[in-house]
Amino acid sequence: MARIFVVGAGVVGTAVGRAFVEAGHAVTLVDLSPARVDALVASGLDATTQLDLRGEPSSFVFLTVPTPAGPQGYDLRAVASASRDVGVAIGQAHAERGAAGRHSSRRDARTEGDGYAVHTVVTRSTVPPGTTTQLVGPTVARASGTAEGAGFVLAANPEFLRGESAEDDVRWPRLTVVGARSRRVAERLAALLAPFGGDLRLFDSPETAELVKCAHDLYTATRISFWNEMALVAGRLGIDAGDVATTVAGSAEACADPARSARAGAPFTGRCLEKDADGFLAFARELGLGMPLLGAVVGVNRELVAPPVADLRDAARGRVLDLREAERQEAAWRPAPV
């Protein structure tokens, strides 16, 4: 049984807390709202307005605070505030254990093993890549008077929850992502999460896990906008957009073989993709419809054609799409001339 604290008891935090309780762990939810805390307590959960780690030699502390976006980007003030609170609580816990704990020498987080008396601070909120290491970690360190690897360790475990089914999405996740610079920290957190099932991916940096979550949401948003654009065209032509979407969902290479289309570093090419993108944009204009998303796709592709292949190889870490092979594969699908 693990000792778990969930800082931020909104939709995500409450769902996470309930799932851990059901899994048999000792869980305390922390929220600044007394009314919310009272409601949680009334529902049978342990909740408080102030994080207290005294008497806790080790724990998992999940940050599940809101990160709304505005004109200036993500608002990370709640993350910073929660990180300060976590740091203060860690500092108080170390002070209680005495000078030996408070002044322990810094140890590399990569060498920490199971059973060590530190607190694992886990960023569960959706944040831009770098937040865990550049904001959460330094803030906790300053507020606690301890160093990462001595009094606490860091990990990112972004949520993939839907508002209408948040609790079920925690109980039965399709995907769980863990990122930490320490392999042992990642494995400890993975061991805590593995019983929930689903595809579990471990990465060697919090930034990778954070970017996975951002890319996941943005990819979903892009596909929705794509079909909204296509629905405008279908509507203008009197065609049922649903029939088109459900058919393409099973036929397009990006859907039938997602891994094949997930390679980055080179533009799409061949006889069909470029031609159809340009041609359909012109067709939509004839219908009096703008297609800004498709137009942006074409624009990005043209920009990628310009850099030398060496630059693309660097961007893709050596994985450059073999354009000639792509054209050969495409040719195999074209009917023979008659």
State what each model feature region is.
Residues M1-D52, E56, F60, D322, ...:
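NAD(P)+-binding Rossmann beta1-loop-alpha1 motif at the extreme N-terminus of oxidoreductases
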Residues P57-S58, V118, P173:
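Local beta-strand N-terminus motif with an aromatic residue
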Residues L63-V65, R124-S125, G179:
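Short, well-ordered coil/turn residues at beta-beta hairpins
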Residues P66-P71, T208-A209:
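A short, flexible beta-alpha/helix-coil linker loop
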Residues A69-F160:
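Rossmann-like NAD(P)(H) cofactor-binding subdomain of soluble oxidoreductases
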Residues P138-N157, R162, A166-A256, F283-L289, ...:
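Internal alpha-helical scaffold of NAD(P)-dependent oxidoreductase catalytic cores
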Residues G235-V338:
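NAD(P)-dependent Rossmann-like dehydrogenase/reductase catalytic/cofactor-binding core
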